């Protein structure tokens, strides 16, 4: 009985459909997953002539830590807000979670601007004022380089030309490619 059911045309059709579906999902995972990984590598890895966004985030973490050291004796509330936002980015940074880094970076930008305003309003001595200027310059420079990174255009191009087009958009969701 078992041998006869495998020879039945409907059984053969179902097996063929399942095999094709499985092959399509595996191909999508491999091809799109490979391209997504390549783009993510551009976020994490510096290339000749351009440092990665990941390394620029490290600069922002360093600059925000420096600002925190100035601010902690001047405005505890602003220092705490900066510390919380910095910790969130540091956690995302250490886990290498790009989406979480994006969100935490936006929050750190707000907290840094607020902390900068609080530090500028405080009466700083000459060395603190010089350090503040250096931290702000480093932070803003890193932010500008992140905005101008070629990674951003490569993500946009990939999303427009591949990921958001049918059938890749449907298959990626189905295959679990993020």
Which residues does each PLM region occupy?
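A helix-centric hydrophobic-segment signal that preferentially recognizes long
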Residues: 2-178
């Amino acid at each position: 009985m078992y041998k006869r059911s495998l020879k039945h045309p409907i059984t053969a059709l179902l097996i063929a459909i399942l095999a094709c579906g499985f092959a399509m999902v595996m191909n999508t995972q491999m091809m799109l997953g490979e391209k997504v990984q390549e783009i993510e590598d551009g976020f994490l890895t510096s290339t000749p002539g351009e440092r990665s966004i990941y390394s620029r985030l490290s600069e922002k973490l360093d600059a925000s830590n420096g600002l925190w050291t100035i601010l902690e004796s001047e405005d505890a509330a602003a220092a705490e807000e900066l510390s919380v936002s910095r910790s969130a980015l540091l956690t995302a940074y250490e886990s290498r979670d790009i989406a979480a880094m994006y969100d935490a970076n936006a929050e750190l930008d707000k907290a840094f601007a607020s902390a900068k305003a609080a530090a500028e309003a405080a009466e700083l001595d000459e060395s603190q004022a010089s350090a503040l200027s250096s931290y702000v310059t480093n932070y803003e420079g890193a932010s500008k380089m992140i905005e101008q990174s070629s990674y951003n255009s490569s993500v946009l191009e990939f999303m427009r030309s591949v990921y958001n087009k049918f059938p890749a958009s449907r298959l990626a969701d189905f295959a679990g490619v993020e």
